[in-house]
């Protein structure tokens, strides 16, 4: 098992890519704290995982990631209960597609608060524990739109571009302390959000992917597993694209 007895925290872990990451980490022997936005979604995800993987060591929490005090308290509790924090997966985020003419400052702030500041708060919560043990891994979820933009919802690609910069800067600062920081930039992935897209809209998008299909959450999760494992012990400051060579 690649992550045996590692203590991992996964935000946005109740569905989609985050849920797949939690599941993959559990199968590799990690103990996982699953963060979700609401208690019912966290508890439902934990129940589903334990039903599928009876030996799974997984717990759910639901702090508001925009609230630095709630995040600090949550990470202090995790560290105190488990003795350490080995892996942080910053996956929580929000996407939207409002045309620029209808954009408001409040909407822009909402996207940035969760996608960027929430990630910052979580890293601040985890890093002190990692520094104490002289090692740790932080993995951030970016997106292919951080490289190419998108025609609406301007705050989302801006936020993911910021994620890339945060990843590279934090990697440089924390490398001497034994903490690796990387990001994964998924392309078009088959999540609940994508399944709601009409087929006539999705088909042209698929046609732009050289591999000829959309990706699966489990494929992104395996990238997280690799980057969290000792197999990636000399990799830091990388934004790994998992997009089938899609280019918007």
PLM segments and residue spans:
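Active-site helix of classical SDR
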Residues: 123, 159, 167
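Conserved glycine-rich cofactor-binding loop
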Residues: 7, 14-16
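Short, small/polar-rich loop/turn modules that mediate ligand/substrate recognition or access, typified
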Residues: 89, 175, 180, 235-237
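Substrate-binding pocket helix/loop in short-chain dehydrogenase/reductase
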Residues: 99-100, 107-109, 194, 201, ...
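Residue(s) in the substrate-gating loop at a strand-loop-helix junction
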Residues: 143
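C-terminal substrate-recognition "lid" of short-chain dehydrogenase/reductases
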Residues: 2, 120, 135, 213-242, ...
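Alpha-helical segment proximal to the catalytic Tyr-Lys
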Residues: 128, 172-176, 233
């Amino acid at each position: 098992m690649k992550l045996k007895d590692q203590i991992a925290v996964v935000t946005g872990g109740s569905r989609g890519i985050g849920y797949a990451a939690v599941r993959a980490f559990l199968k590799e022997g990690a103990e996982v704290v699953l963060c979700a936005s609401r208690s019912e979604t966290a508890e439902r995800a934990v129940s589903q995982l334990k039903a599928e993987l009876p030996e799974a060591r997984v717990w759910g929490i639901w702090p508001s990631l925009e609230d630095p005090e709630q995040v600090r308290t949550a990470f202090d509790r995790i560290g105190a209960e488990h003795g350490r924090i080995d892996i942080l997966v910053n996956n929580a985020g929000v996407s939207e597609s409002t045309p620029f003419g209808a954009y408001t400052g409040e909407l822009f702030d909402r996207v940035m608060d969760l996608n960027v500041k929430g990630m910052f708060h979580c890293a601040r919560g985890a890093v002190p524990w990692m520094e104490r043990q002289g090692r740790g891994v932080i993995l951030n979820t970016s997106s292919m739109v951080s490289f190419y933009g998108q025609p609406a919802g301007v705050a989302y690609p801006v936020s993911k571009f910021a994620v890339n910069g945060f990843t590279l800067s934090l990697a440089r600062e924390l490398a001497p302390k034994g903490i690796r920081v990387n990001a994964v930039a998924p392309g078009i992935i088959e999540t609940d959000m994508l399944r709601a897209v009409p087929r006539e809209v999705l088909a042209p998008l698929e046609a732009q992917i050289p591999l000829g299909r959309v990706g699966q959450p489990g494929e992104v999760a395996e990238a997280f597993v690799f980057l969290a494992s000792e197999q990636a012990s000399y990799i830091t400051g990388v934004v790994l694209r998992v997009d089938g060579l899609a280019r918007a």
